[in-house]
């Protein structure tokens, strides 16, 4: 499994259930990296998507806190163990965690690749992920040129777990 996330300089990823900023280049990157794959998310992440609907062209796997939660067009799993079992049904590169912070932090070190958009600014955030640069078994294997949108600079990084 893998994960994709955008984080600011302090590894903040969200505030009040929303992204810190909307960068069309980052959203395009997310689409390119996830289309045709299984995307794993919590309920709040699902409900923050446009219209609160599953992402088209992907298998949407949702782990809600509420055991009675149902959502049309989604595969609902009830525990981390069930989530891991469901993810094992897909090729390793065919599963992408897309949020939120609880899932990222729980599963980050189980991921083969971390696709991280580093935003070169600090935002007021209330949701954070672990600092990928401090994870001992990961190294950067690719990084893009720096991008800029609406005066906000950012860069794409791919981290790989060393075997």
Placement of each model-derived feature along the sequence:
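Extreme N-terminal starter segment of soluble prokaryotic enzymes
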Residues: 1-3
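Flexible, gly/pro- and Lys/Arg-enriched active-site loops
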Residues: 5-38, 43-78, 84-163
């Amino acid at each position: 499994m893998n994960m994709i996330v955008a984080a600011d300089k302090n590894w903040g990823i969200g505030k009040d259930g929303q992204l810190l900023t909307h960068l069309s280049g980052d959203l395009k990157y997310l689409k390119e990296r996830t289309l045709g794959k299984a995307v794993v998310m919590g309920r709040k992440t699902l409900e923050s998507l446009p219209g609160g609907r599953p992402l088209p062209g992907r298998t949407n796997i949702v782990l809600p806190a509420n055991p009675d939660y149902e959502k049309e067009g989604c595969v609902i799993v009830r525990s981390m163990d069930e989530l891991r079992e469901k993810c094992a049904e897909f090729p390793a590169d065919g599963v992408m965690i897309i949020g939120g912070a609880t899932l990222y932090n729980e599963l980050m070190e189980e991921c083969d690749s971390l696709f991280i958009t580093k935003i070169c600014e600090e935002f007021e955030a209330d949701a954070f992920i672990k600092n990928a640069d401090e994870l001992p078994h990961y190294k950067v294997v690719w990084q893009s040129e720096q991008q800029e949108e609406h005066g906000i600079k950012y860069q794409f990084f791919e981290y790989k777990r060393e075997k």
